[in-house]
Amino acid sequence: YERLIVNLRQLDCTTFVENVTALSVCARENYSSFSDYCRILKKLRYWGGEIKNYTSRLHYFSWWGLDNQKKGFITEVSCGDSLFSATQVLSVDYMTNNSHLYKHLSSNAFYRDSIRNYENLYNGLKFSFLPKNRLKNSKDIISKIRSGDIIAIVTNKKGLDISHVGIAIWIKGKLHLMHASSLKKKVIIDDLTLYDYSMKQKSNLGIRVFRIVGF
């Protein structure tokens, strides 16, 4: 049984970004009730905004990006920009190849097959991203990336597309990441610039950037 869980006390990187997006949409539309917020969060979190079962959730962030562009919540900033010169070919299968790590998949062949069908359906899609070495020169990117944009870190880890997500924030002319840190166990604005943060992580290839519509 799948239901919408709202928990603002315990956030991972994805639920942090989802909640920021939901609150932003509510602010833009002048929605002020908790039920409005829950309705928007549900729309963001699930394929087509509908909860049927565990497989209704947008489990990989590339899926989240695609479906929420379709629903009109976000746009991808990188489209057609020469700075975003690298290409990621989607090839996700981490969940189905490691189904023992997911309690809903380890005991349910129908769910496993359903997730695998989604994986196969979207694998092969190509996405432009900004290579991490291009983050070094703030002058190049300051006109492209705004504070409040969603940053998705592209990874070369097998079976995954995005390793971490957060919110862009400019501080003294340098781009930083606001994110739910698994290391610090809380939401932080990282002391490191996004360039330095990315260079420390060998598996990080670069970033995709999404903007909440209306901001």
Protein language model annotation of sequence segments:
Residues 107-108, 131, 193:
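Helix N-terminus capping/helix-initiation residues
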Residues 129-141:
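Short alpha-helix capping/helix-loop boundary micro-motifs
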